């Protein structure tokens, strides 16, 4: 019981800035895991990694590097938001971030991001991401969310 109080006290000493920065970097790492999954799936379907990464950019003349960097940037921003949400909301009613709960919260967040993309962001666009199967996008977002939940929990445990 003392260990839980100690971790909670350490967590309370962390600033919102700490949570934002840790969420940013965790989001970028989780974005790499998501891109790796989509890259492997598309390789098995005959598409090169360069073609896959170019899909992440919105213009027709996008380079794979630009697409990958844009994906990392968006993943980082979503991770930052997740880090802040966890700090401001979720940790108010969770005394200790158990691994299973962290993964579940991350997966729920990934699912929300997928719904946001499918309902708000992609319908009015000519994005090549719309050509990727919804099943694979779902799995990719769950991978992103699970990785984000694990990484954010790991970062919280190392705050001090």
Give the residues covered by each predicted segment.
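Juxtamembrane/disordered regions of integral membrane proteins
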Residues: 2-160
């Amino acid at each position: 019981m003392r260990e839980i109080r100690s971790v909670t006290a350490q967590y309370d000493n962390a600033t919102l800035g700490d949570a934002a920065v840790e969420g940013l970097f965790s989001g970028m790492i989780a974005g790499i895991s998501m891109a790796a999954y989509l890259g492997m799936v598309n390789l098995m379907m005959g598409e090169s990694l360069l073609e896959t990464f170019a899909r992440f950019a919105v213009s027709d003349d996008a380079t794979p590097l630009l697409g990958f960097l844009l994906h990392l940037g968006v993943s980082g921003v979503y991770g930052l938001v997740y880090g802040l949400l966890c700090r401001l909301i979720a940790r108010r009613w969770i005394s200790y971030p158990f691994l299973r709960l962290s993964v579940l919260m991350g997966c729920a967040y990934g699912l929300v991001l997928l719904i946001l993309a499918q309902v708000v962001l992609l319908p009015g666009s000519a994005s090549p991401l719309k050509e990727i199967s919804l099943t694979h996008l779902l799995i990719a977002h769950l991978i992103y969310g699970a990785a984000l939940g694990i990484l954010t929990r790991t970062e919280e445990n190392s705050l001090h």
